[in-house]
Amino acid sequence: MPRRPGTMRAVLSILAVAGLTGAGVLTPASAQAVDPEPAPCPASLPEGTNCSSGRSVDGAWYWVAYPRDWNGTLIVHAHGGPRTGEPQPNDPVEDLDRFSMMVGEGYAWAGSAYRRGGYGVRMAARDTDDLRQIVWDHFGKPRRTILHGQSWGGNVAAKAAELYAVAPDGSRNYDGVILTSGLLAGGTRGYTFRADLRAVYQFYCQNHPRPTEARYPLWQGLPEGASMSRADLSARVEECTGLSISPEARTPAQAMALRNILSVTGVTADTLVAHLAWATNLFQDIVWKRLGGANPFSNSGTTYVGSDNDVALNQGVERFEADPAAVAALAYDADLTGNIVLPTLTLHARYDPTVSVSHEAIYAQTVATAGRSDLLGQVFTTEALHSRLSTPQYLAILAAMKNWLDTGQRPSASDVAALCVTFLDRSAEPCLIDTGFRPRLDTR
């Protein structure tokens, strides 16, 4: 269907406001590039590792680690989140420590904090690839470069691979891509369930916002300029659901609210506050700072099921309709085309409580539609974890990528499982790869 001229103008206007056109966002006014300088390594890294930190010309802090027995491969890492606060010089150390097993196995590692906090997949992808160039310029081009994204960083790395895999001269900037616990449904499909959560939570709790507070559409997260701490949000959830107390201590109203919220949305009790925080502070960032106040979320056609009274829920829940221009702007920034050109492996826990494993089904479909399924391998575990899976599995996925690049043969899940066993002596953690699992496509 032809796009209406007015809609197209609105898309371009939103992109301009969001800073999503061209090179991304403006460089922080106070940013000054800092070349890599020696820095103390985290204690989790092997003895003899050389660590450096610096800042890109666009203001992105970064850390780099080279082990003494470097194997010639560099891992360029894209972190998750997104973090909504101002990036700090040592932010990358958190993921350097989390993935220290990679450095321990002989891989060099580089991670960026990105130039600013908040949402922006293209911005983060640009900063990630800029870090690759910084490392190449200062430490020399490695034998191989692997792009790795974790959680939201999986969206970032997948976008970076689509945008920057091939240099203008036709050479390749990366040899392979590894995406772990990745948010691979993209921007327009990756946050729908959190918009649903805000609506369902408010139906049962009526305290975010409270009746005494200014009303605002729930899709905004918060009004422009407002703030809410995690402690405040947690207190509201506790007040309504008795989340932290024993089931026996909850009032009937609290038990009913918690039961229905979890049943309808599918989130776990342990992650309820975290998901609501994303649907509060991150939504505020997306809507007001990236989309100029426009709404990218919709639940107008959603039928909610699983409650004690679905009829009452669907009649009383707040409804909202997305602005097509906002959806298009978010899609431009964060959706994926599936047009991959590099060997790509994903690793995801079946029961991931933060990023549903259904993201993998969506990504597989996206890649298949682009005709690139031969470049994608997906591996799943039986874990119910997100931020960090079992150590041998990360080492196995890296070894599987090496074998793929060496032989040209895409590894199967069984191949990765067999490799995993060979790394059991690296830690006390198990191999939990499920070789027969394939996720279902989530239509919502």
Enumerate the language-model features and the residues they cover:
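Alpha/beta-hydrolase-fold serine-hydrolase catalytic core, especially in secreted/extracellular enzymes
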Residues: 35, 46, 240, 244-280, ...
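Gly/Ser-rich "nucleophile elbow"/oxyanion-hole loop immediately N-terminal to the catalytic nucleophile
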Residues: 69-70, 131-151
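N-terminal cap/lid segment of alpha/beta-hydrolase-fold proteins
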Residues: 34-71, 312-321
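Short beta-strand element of the alpha/beta-hydrolase
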Residues: 72-83
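Secretory targeting and sorting signals
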Residues: 1-33
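Short beta-strand/loop motif that positions the catalytic acidic residue
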Residues: 340, 345-348, 352
